Amino acid sequence: MHTVIRSYSGSGATALFDILEERKEEVESLIRAVTGFVSYSLVRTTDGGVTVTVCQDKAGTDESLQLAREWIQANVANIDVSPPAVTEGSNILYLS
């Protein structure tokens, strides 16, 4: 399995997570369609938020990154959102 973590802070991050929360059903539908989807978390922080996507392989997490980028461009272009810090890697242990 492969995990990608996107950390949003700075300009527009809080507003972005307000919109993501308002439209969480749409976000869920989009992410569940990712090839090899395993799990997803949308986490609010004091200065924005974090998303954690787990897929069967790197191809799935790459697809999720592209879909997230496209969704943000299409739905929150009016907010000046700083690009996320992206961390990714292969899972050593996954519990559910």
Feature map (PLM): residue ranges:
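Short S/T/G/P-rich N-terminal loop/turn motif that feeds into the first structured element of a domain
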Residues: 1-52, 56-70, 77-96
